[in-house]
Structures are given as C-alpha cells and as structure tokens.
Amino acid sequence: MDALAGLSPRTRAWFTGAFAAPTPAQEAAWPAIATGAHVLVQAPTGSGKTLAAFLTGIDRLDRAPGAGLRLLYVSPLKALNYDVERNLRGPLAGLGSQLTVGVRTGDTSQKERRELIRTPPDILITTPESLFLLLTSQARDVLRGVETVVLDEVHAVAGTKRGAHLALSLERLERVVERPFQRIGLSATQRPLAEIGKFVGGGRPIELVDAGTRKALDLEVVVPVEDMRELGATSALVQPVLPDGVEMASGYEATTRSIWPSIYPAVLELVRAHRSTIVFVNNRRLSERLAARLNELADAEVARAHHGSLAREQRVEIEELLKAGQIPCLVATSSLELGIDMGAVD
C-alpha cells in the first residue's frame, strides 16, 4: 500500500522531492491518520514521526488557509515547541503554503498573546499549561474550530500530575469545539503501549501504530579515579556542587575530598575528542558551574549552560551555536532531554 496515497498530489510531489522514501514510522502512521481515527504512533527519536503527524494535517488545512485555528500541537517542553516551529518552515515553504503558525508558551509576551487571539494562526504550538490557560479564559473561543490535536512526547507526561491536567484540558476542549477532533499521540518507545493509548484517547477507541525499534546503544561507565577511597584534595574553587537552595554547612573547610577535580578534565577530554557533545546534569546550578569550570580548564569558551531559567532568546541562541558547530559542548538540565532536533550530536 502506498503510504502517500492519502495526501494531495502537491504534497506527495513535495515529499518525494525532499526525501528518498518515507520512514517506517511514516509508512505505518499515514494510512492510520488518514482514516480520521485517533492514533498513537510509537517510534524512536529521529524516526520522522512528528512530520508524520503534521504532514497530513497541513495537507488538510492547505485546502482552506486562513479559516482559523484548526491544528493544535501540544508538547511538554518549551524548547521542543520552538524547535518544531522552526522545522515546520521547510515543509510550508516547500509546499508554497499560506498557512500560519503561532507559538503560545510561558515565554510568549502579552502583546503576542493578544495578537494570537485577534488573528488566530492555522496551527498553534503550545504546552499543557498554556492550553489550560487558554481554556480557562475568554481566549478559548479561538479553539472552537480545532480539528486535530497532536500530542508529542506523551510518554513524558502520561501517569504524572502534568498528564492528569492535560487529560482534563483535552476533555474541556471536547466541550468547546464544534465537532470532535482527531487525537494523534507521538511517543518514544514506551511499554505498555496500550496504557499510553488509553491516555491519548481518553478511553475512546484508538489505533496503535508500533514503529518502535531497539537502537544499538554504546554505553560505557567511566570512573575517573582508580580508587574511590583515594580522592584528591580540592580547594574551595571546586567545592562540592550542592542542590539549589542548599547552603554549605558552617565549619566547612576550604579543603575537602571530592571526585570533581578528576571529573572536570575527564569531561573536557571527551568534549575535545568530539565535534559536539551534550552533558546532562541534575540542576541549573550544576550546569552553570560545570560549564564555567570546563571553560576555565580549556582557557577558552568550549561549553555553555542550558536550562529552563534562561530567557527564551538565550536558549535558542545556545541551541543554534551547537547546531552550527560554533560551540562544542552544552551542559544541560532536562530542558534538552526530549526529542529536540539538535543535528549531529556525537
């Protein structure tokens, strides 16, 4: 069966010109999505599942651009939203589409929010929290024409408090829209798939598309000291990293024993051995301290910190630096842990 059969000739022509062939996730997802049924697509990051969800929606909307907000995309991470908005530019430009795209997150200014209400885009990219705010204000009227809701990275919220709030928001949206909307869930490999499907469908029938494949993992545990009982002494310059809000106890001396003096050069060696590296840490304070220490050891800016407390413009700038190869390392919190397209990261 031709996976592109449900798309318009123009969309098929653009896709075949831009890509060699559909990915397995796209081949499995497009026929299911084309039926109008609720669908959950499970596939690993980089499998093209986001385009699988969007291309059918764009194809439908392109027949009547400017008719108001009809496609809603929800993801749990602001950085992912802006990444998706950038990645949509290619297909829309390639199709010569007049469809408009808006982003509504906690970073959106009041002026931009008013403009979204006054002139709703055809496609709105948002977060669960911003969707809740839209539904509990007069702005919910812009959602009446929604026909399709794409729920990305649903495995990250299913079974959590955020997931419960999102599920409630979707049911509220059902009462606002003019007719029932199609739900398309996108998930990384997660088991059991049926449970994630129940979350996406809200108890309604849903078609499960399992395009999950187990990737070959290259895992290595590295301990930068031969004997953990013989940690070197460290000065106050590299004092132990504490969680946010935790202060050093009184009586702490300038010299203590820590593994960090051995970790810093080991991480720097890995950074220098690769074109691009992302180091994940547990909190904002550690991301900033580790990036600063790497730069100090390298005597050059080789690393930048990335976390949710940075302004949106700063986060986007830092992400673009890594993508362009202008900086070899990002030290990030969970702000980059989901399926963001960072290009070729070694």
What are the functions of these language-model segments?
Residues M1-A13, A21-A28, A34-S47, A52-D346:
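Helicase motor core with emphasis on the C-terminal RecA-like subdomain
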